[in-house]
A protein has these predicted regions:
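C-terminal substrate-binding subdomain of Rossmann-fold SDR/epimerase-dehydratase oxidoreductases
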Residues: 1-132
């Protein structure tokens, strides 16, 4: 509490934040879509091995959020301002990333959709219940 947080690229970064319930839902649905031995693999064209079919599937909403907006949601949920240590861009980092959930949606019909305005307060409430 009260410790400064490092904010890289002076907050001029975007990330695709995924709420835990969306992640669990995506994994649960993917488990039901797992290849079964001896049966044709649906969407096998994206599998890297015909012998042991497997996939890398992004689970994210594909909606990048500005880091400063994310921090603002945390501040709002906690009812106090963050102590920010503004830092330059770090070597090897990128200004924006987001998930492409097209394969997830094709396999399961699901795409994560919980906005940070819902997910961040829920996370903060959960944390407070357990650790405050």
């Amino acid at each position: 509490a009260g410790q400064p947080i490092d904010v890289y690229n002076h907050g001029q970064m975007s990330r695709d934040f995924t709420y835990i319930d969306d992640l669990v839902e995506g994994i649960t649905r993917l488990m039901a879509a797992a290849p079964i031995k001896g049966q044709p693999v649906i969407g096998a064209e994206d599998s890297l091995s015909p012998v042991a079919p497997w996939r890398v599937v992004n689970i994210g909403g594909g909606q990048p959020v500005q880091l400063l907006d994310f921090i603002a949601e945390i501040e709002k949920a906690l009812g106090r301002p963050a102590v920010r240590n503004m830092m330059p861009m770090q070597p090897g980092d990128v200004p924006a990333t987001w998930a492409s959930a097209e394969l997830l949606q094709a396999l399961t019909g699901y795409c994560p959709s919980t906005p940070i305005s819902v997910g961040v307060p829920a996370l903060c409430d959960w944390y407070r219940e357990r650790y405050a």
